[in-house]
Amino acid sequence: MKTVRSKNVVVGADFAGFPLKEAVKRHLEERGWTVTDLTPVLEETPMYHRVGFSLGAQIAEGRFERALAFCGTGMGIHIAASKVPHVHAAVCESVPSARRASAANNANLLAMGAFYVAPRTAMAMADAFLASE
């Protein structure tokens, strides 16, 4: 398992995942994380597949060790990110699965679906995923 050496993370969302991404981003920033947001403006967010591929590229190019991706179900953005070499993406809907995705499966990108994951749960999932060694 690759540990996170820095408190830097990249995030991105399509229109459906945007509000959840914003909640998680604020939460992480309050906890001292430096969050790079590839989709900072709702009206300018691309479709899920473009966001997923962009997030994956950030990991593949070595700019970030971990990424958080948000769309309606988490599945579409996960599929797109998984097409990028060196990306090991996981779709999770619970804190234990997010923790295990990182710790046991060496996932480096966590995808969440805003249709199924509430903001507080998403915050706890992000914490578990990013803290997992």
Where is each model-derived feature located?
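Glycine-rich phosphate/diphosphate-binding loop of Rossmann-like nucleotide-binding domains
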Residues: 10-30, 35
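Short Gly/Thr/Asp-enriched flexible loops that form oxyanion-binding sites at enzyme active sites
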Residues: 76-87
